[in-house]
Amino acid sequence: MVSERIRAMGSRHWLLLFGVIGTAWGLLYAMALPSDLRAAGQVYGLDFLTQLCVVTPDAAGLFRVTLMWCLMSAAMMAPTVLPALATYDDLAQTVPDTNFAHLVAGYLMVWLGFSILAALLQMGLFYADLVSLFGDSRSATLSSMLLILAGLYQFSPVKEACLSKCRQPMMFFLQYWTDGPWRNGIRLGLVCLGCCWALMLLAFVGGVMNLVFMGIATVIMMIEKLPQIGQYLTKPLGIFLVASSVWVLLSGW
């Protein structure tokens, strides 16, 4: 069974998806490089990456911040939905009216909407002098509020309901199959958003362009959606985040 799944993931649509994920991480890595190394990239025709990192408090800056969040969402959220996509791919072998690309496009469309809202929030926080232009929190109060929000959300019924669907992708697709791949992709994206939006906003605490934070957060969200072990992570993570919020507020970090 495992060998069959590995072979199936060698097909074109899977390779394209892995290419999107890899490209997103590669661009984020390039954007996170120190400015002198990014400038050196101009010699190799990579000056466009330098321009992407020039974030300014105007419309062009908002576009760049939105692009940054889009890359983050693709890099971090696409890996967390791989088990659900594998389930869909298995069903597609026996059920008609399937389209893997439409499903993924619908899913990513939801995260595009989130990225736009997150970029607007980042610019608003910047104008309030609560974060830097690159989204790093300048306020212990803001960091503490985001941590306690994410921590308490771990215990919410909404989070639990969304996680239950993420952990049972077979039941999810069978329930909504007749809606078609595009609408199912959007619905899957909304369910994922319901699971992860609060954790994603912790980028303002960990650093929007902090690759270590992104990597850790991605692994946590992937594990949390696994049916066998995810349930053992959700509430302890919530306790840890609430405790961290208290520590940040008291320490003024």
Region roles according to the model:
Residues 7, 219-243:
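Interfacial loop-to-transmembrane junctions
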Residues 53-74, 143-150, 176-188:
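Small-residue-enriched transmembrane helix starts and helix-helix packing motifs
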Residues 118-126, 193-212:
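Alpha-helical transmembrane segments and their membrane-interface junctions
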Residues 1-70, 126-135, 157-175, 242, ...:
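Histidine-/acidic- and/or cysteine-rich, low-complexity loops and terminal segments associated
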Residues 152, 157-198:
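A mid-sequence, solvent-exposed acidic-amphipathic segment
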Residues 115-122, 191, 195, 244-253:
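Hydrophobic alpha-helical transmembrane segments in multi-pass integral membrane proteins
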Residues 112-127, 140-167:
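Transmembrane alpha-helix/helix-exit interface in multi-pass inner-membrane proteins
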Residues 6, 65-108, 112:
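Juxtamembrane transmembrane-helix termini in multi-pass membrane transport proteins
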